[in-house]
Design a protein with these regions (language model features):
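Glycine-rich, mobile lid/loop segments that gate access to catalytic sites or pores
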Residues: 23-211
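Active-site-surrounding "flap" and adjacent substrate/cofactor-binding loops of secreted or lumenal enzymes
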Residues: 8-22
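Short beta-strand scaffold segments in enzyme catalytic cores
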Residues: 1-2, 118
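Short glycine/threonine-rich loop-to-helix capping motif typified by GTGT followed
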Residues: 3-12, 202-212
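Short N-terminal amphipathic alpha-helices
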Residues: 1, 12-15, 29-34
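Intrinsic structural disorder
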Residues: 1, 16-20, 188-189, 212
Length: 212
């Protein structure tokens, strides 16, 4: 669903843009139960009120106004170059590299688009990062190992085998690439052999994305 308001004389192909974005994210297969060519795209975008628009569009750009107001709050930190918390920055980096691996299609070929990550960092009493304690990576994947039969035990065995492969790939393929992409010595020093990895903690993540 595309919703909002705008005043413009330009033509925008909302259907095409929405489908291209969905395709770029990676939802391109019917087996995902949501894909770019067949999903419904509903537009609820309407023209902005002229009363609001008169306060937005001015002849003098220096007098350009705002049609509405809002209150936001937040903070910046000097932990990273983009002024975001280090734990969030690392989690984003993990997901970016994971998406790169999926798009390349050379290793971890079972990857599907949906994923999330969390990084827990230990700090000293002065607020300085000391070490990475825990990394969580949950990634959607194909059902790439089928059970030997219809029994619950066979299904559990297949799920455990898949989880073992995914965990091994996260630790030995994904994370080395993440670390190689970091060029800040202080950040690199936070990685250690005692990091606790939680990979797909629920055990299986085949159903995901909008369908999930």
């Amino acid at each position: 669903v595309l919703a909002g308001e705008v005043k413009t004389k330009a033509y925008v192909d909302l259907q095409l843009i929405a489908r291209e974005v969905i395709k770029k994210i990676g939802y391109t297969k019917g087996e995902y139960m949501f894909e770019s060519n067949s999903c419904g795209v509903l537009s609820a975008i309407h023209e902005q009120s002229p009363d609001i628009n008169r306060g937005v569009e001015r002849q003098d750009p220096m007098e350009q106004g705002a049609g509405d107001q809002g209150m936001m709050f937040g903070y910046a930190t000097n932990e990273t170059e983009n002024y975001m918390p280090l734990s969030l920055d690392l989690a984003h980096r993990i997901l970016q590299v994971l998406a790169d691996i999926r798009r390349e299609g050379e290793v971890m070929t079972y990857l599907r688009p949906d994923s999330k990550s969390q990084v827990t960092i230990e700090y000293d009493d002065n607020g300085n990062p000391v070490r990475i304690d825990t990394i969580v990576v949950s990634t959607q994947h194909d059902d790439f190992i089928q059970p030997a039969d219809d029994s619950e035990a066979a299904q559990l065995k297949a799920d455990e085998e898949m989880l073992g492969i995914i965990r091994n790939d996260v630790v030995n393929i994904l994370m080395p690439r993440v670390i190689a992409s970091i060029h800040h010595e202080k950040v690199l020093s936070l990685f250690n052999d005692n990091i606790k990895y939680h990979v797909n903690p629920t055990g299986k993540f085949v159903i995901g994305g909008p369908h999930g």
